[in-house]
Amino acid sequence: MFKTFIIAAVAVATVRAAVIGHDQVVPFAQPTPTSISQTTAVNFKPQLHITNGCHPYPAVDADGNTSGGLNPTGSSSAGCKGSGYGSQIYGRSAWYNGVWAIMYSWYFPKDSPSSGFGHRHDWEHIVVWLDNPAVASPKILAVSTSAHSGYTVYYPPNSNYLNGKSAKIDYYSILLINHAFRMTSDAGETQNLIMWDQMTDAARTALQNTDFGDANVPFKDGNFESKLANAWYQ
């Protein structure tokens, strides 16, 4: 009887999760931190400036429903100038080579530098490298920003690129080259942060298994560790 109940519950969960409209995904509220790592991630949450292209959207909801994204048609920001439900920034952190790494990621429904160019879905991310999250005043050692399957490393970042503890990040494209991140002196906006370990099982499973086409979830298992290695600043 118990086994039957478990199978039925899994079946219901599987049925409930679906690909839905990019503007129908409800983001997670930002939880109250319950650990040093979560508190540090909130304290160093970056801000995002959009030079051109889509604004960030939530990629997954608590039930595991994922965004269907957008075709790269119309202007670079057509149909994706912001969700009525609010946006989301995703985080995951770990020690790497004796340094504390916080990966912050954003999802965009399309990466379209110009009408007809680009692709559905875009994931971009940064890694903020800290000396130690447990000390009274952790220090930013470097920031690595994703750019066309590689990284631009700011070691150390220019003070104009920081607002206190918050790195200022720009989402941009030039001509017909797909979007990327860079640091900027321009102020941006922040989004509610949800860490990998704060998500529901359904959301983690969805991000782990969903095919986002030419984009990939940088912080999921199997990607997170290799991305940190590639983003390493030394």
Curated annotation (Swiss-Prot):
Localization per Swiss-Prot or TrEMBL: Secreted
Protein's UniProt keywords contain Acyltransferase: no
Motif Conserved undecapeptide motif I in this chain: 101-111
Segment forming the signal sequence: 1-17
Carbohydrate attachment residues: N65
Motif (Hepta-peptide GHRHDWE motif II): 118-124
Keywords assigned by UniProt, alphabetized: Glycoprotein, Secreted, Signal, Virulence
Induction of its expression: Expression reached the highest levels at 3 days after inoculation of pepper leaves, followed by a gradual decline.
Keyword Protein biosynthesis: no
InterPro entries in the cross-refs: NPP1
Gene Ontology CC terms, in alphabetical order: extracellular region
Pfam families linked: NPP1 (PF05630)
Recorded family membership: Belongs to the Necrosis inducing protein (NPP1) family.
Biological role stated in the UniProt entry: Secreted effector that contributes moderately to virulence during infection by P.capsici. Does not cause visible reaction of C.annuum for several days after inoculation, but by 7 days after inoculation, small necrotic lesions become visible. Leads only to chlorotic areas, without necrosis at 7 days after non-host N.benthamiana leaves infection.
Domain notes: Key residues/motif important for the effector activities are degenerated in most NLPs, including the nlp24 peptide consisting of the conserved region I (11-aa immunogenic part) and conserved region II (the heptapeptide GHRHDWE motif) that is important for phytotoxic activity.
Record's protein name: NLP effector protein 10
